[in-house]
Amino acid sequence: NFQHRPRLDIATFGEVPSRYLLNSEFIPIELKEVYRGVIAQALEGVRRCYDRVGSVDLIRLHGDCHMGNLLWTDEGPHFVDFDDSRMGPAIQDLWMMLSGAPEEMKQQLNEILLGYEDFHDFNPQELHLVEALRTLRLIHYSAWIASRWDDPAFKAAFTWFNTQQYWQDRILELREQIAAMDEPPLMVGGNY
């Protein structure tokens, strides 16, 4: 375990950020109860996904592993931006590397896992966590912006954040995630 790094779990990326947002003044009053209900449903969906997996081994993660944090040089690829590094399930560092239609994502994931398993075993049950982790990331991201809203740089960079439209879009996005978490997980290869 990291000595000074938190875990990525339902509490740290879902429950705590949700409470922060619901106790703040960012969500318009006319949307707050709708948001509260959608967050409750979303977190219940996340719990169901974790229940499907059972025991989850936690490993050291990059935490924000996507193509924007992969720098290519003459020596090859290098990961950057480790400030979100934490303990969590291995799939967290894999799912954000995927893009496109489901068939494309299956192919990408299969290729990633072929290389990944040269270094570490992968528990295919963690595929049930992809949409749950996406949901937690969406919740955490809104709280991350809200917690830094007093910084003028954030107000300049995220002008759309403190608007009615932003929160309407988040409600719709979370409703879509609630449905996605009830779908079968992404499956790849013969063993996954």
Q: Where is each model-derived feature located?
A:
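A cross-family kinase active-site recognition segment
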Residues: 1-34, 58, 157-158
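Short alpha-helical "patches" and their helix-cap loops
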Residues: 4-7, 110-116, 153-165
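N-terminal alpha-helical segment
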Residues: 13-20, 42, 90-93, 109
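ATP/Mg2+ or Mg2+-diphosphate-binding catalytic cores
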Residues: 15, 25-26, 143-192
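Charged, amphipathic alpha-helical oligomerization/scaffolding segments
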Residues: 37-41
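Active-site acidic catalytic loop and adjacent metal/ATP-binding pocket
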Residues: 44-94, 190-192
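Active-site activation/catalytic loop segments of kinase-like enzymes and analogous catalytic loops
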Residues: 90-121, 137-153
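All-alpha amphipathic helical-bundle segments outside canonical DNA-binding/catalytic cores
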Residues: 124-134
